[in-house]
Amino acid sequence: MTAQIIDGKAIAQSIRTQLREQVTARKEAGQRVPGLAVILVGADPASQVYVGSKRKACEEVGFISRSYDLDTSCSEAELLALIDQLNDDPSIDGILVQLPLPAHIEDSKVIERIRPDKDVDGFHPYNVGRLAQRIPVLRSCTPMGIMTLIKSTGVDTYGLDAVVVGASNIVGRPMTLELLLAGCTTTTCHRFTKNLEQKIRQADLVVVAVGKPGFIPGEWIKPGAIVIDVGINRLENGTLVGDVQYETAAQNASFITPVPGGVGPMTIASLLENTLYAAEQYHD
């Protein structure tokens, strides 16, 4: 068996095309164009690349894109004051603060300062809580994008045994909640997990987000399983690889996401979907 590739790049492009059409329809109906504010603190090269991609995608679909590049020395109070200003700005539907933040700024304080109806990253405790209660509104972007990828396979998720490797607030934990909502029997694995191999060998669906190149051997993948690889790791030779040993895994899986071109583009597509959702549900 050779796995079918889940083409995140193509699916994300399709979403952006649909969003562009919806924005055009809003303008023609005399409605406001959605607005997204993106805040970057410091000059971390990876963060600069991510932020640049988000701004470009915004412009592609016709959103208003506002950029705020703050110096690393920016105080927590200054950042919170900017968020307050954007919370009160009626032209802004979504506020995104690129993580990680410098050590002197507390992530949780910043996340909680963003109004829940403008939290298009889906990180605010209110929005995470809504997902936990099975009534999601603004959902965490990477897990939301992964659910779109899984849906594209046509596989019925109800009753599947799913394993999530990694328990971060950004991916692993909300991913577990998304899979529970989709009817999976879900196991979340982390650094204290015993018998990881055994758990993965039994899984119909595996989502891996640990940030370690080739962490999961491909031979562990159950024949016919769906493999979602969230990792994006740059090797010394410049090659980008995922957290799963791709070539071997692709021989066992029924569907697999490539790295790059799998999950990454979907995170940004989901961010754009959330921004339009916020405009329509909360701010129109």
UniProtKB/Swiss-Prot annotation:
GO biological process annotation, one example: tetrahydrofolate interconversion
* UniProt-annotated binding residues for NADP(+): G166, A167, S168, I232
**Key words, A-Z:** Amino-acid biosynthesis, Histidine biosynthesis, Hydrolase, Methionine biosynthesis, Multifunctional enzyme, NADP, One-carbon metabolism, Oxidoreductase, Purine biosynthesis
Reaction it catalyzes: (6R)-5,10-methylene-5,6,7,8-tetrahydrofolate + NADP(+) = (6R)-5,10-methenyltetrahydrofolate + NADPH; (6R)-5,10-methenyltetrahydrofolate + H2O = (6R)-10-formyltetrahydrofolate + H(+)
MF term (GO), any:
methylenetetrahydrofolate dehydrogenase (NADP+) activity
Known pathway: One-carbon metabolism; tetrahydrofolate interconversion
Give the GO cellular component terms, alphabetically. Answer: cytosol
- The source's superkingdom equals Bacteria
What is the E.C. number? Answer: 1.5.1.5, 3.5.4.9
Query: What function does this protein fulfil?
Result: Catalyzes the oxidation of 5,10-methylenetetrahydrofolate to 5,10-methenyltetrahydrofolate and then the hydrolysis of 5,10-methenyltetrahydrofolate to 10-formyltetrahydrofolate.
Similarity-based family: Belongs to the tetrahydrofolate dehydrogenase/cyclohydrolase family.
Subunit structure comment from the entry? Homodimer.
User: What NCBIfam families does UniProt report for this protein, alphabetically?
Assistant: PRK10792.1, PRK14186.1
Q: What is this protein called?
A: Bifunctional protein FolD
The organism encoding this protein is Shewanella oneidensis (strain ATCC 700550 / JCM 31522 / CIP 106686 / LMG 19005 / NCIMB 14063 / MR-1)
